[in-house]
Amino acid sequence: MKVSSSIKADPSKGDKLVRRKGRLYVINKIDPNRKQRQAGPARKK
């Protein structure tokens, strides 16, 4: 999974933007290598 401060999703390639636990993810069931997560502050325990 790639982690970057700014992520972009391309719906024509099957990308979907999802917010989970306060973080932004790009998921792709067609091409799982396109997974991304937006970097942010460290999670609290």
Swiss-Prot record:
Keywords: Ribonucleoprotein, Ribosomal protein. Pfam families: Ribosomal_L36. PROSITE patterns: RIBOSOMAL_L36. Residues 1-20 are annotated as: Disordered. SUPFAM superfamilies: Ribosomal protein L36. InterPro entries: Ribosomal_bL36, Ribosomal_bL36_sp. Coiled coil: none annotated. GO terms for cellular component: ribonucleoprotein complex; ribosome. GO terms for biological process: translation. This is Large ribosomal subunit protein bL36. It comes from Chlamydia abortus (strain DSM 27085 / S26/3). The lineage of its organism: Bacteria, Pseudomonadati, Chlamydiota, Chlamydiia, Chlamydiales.
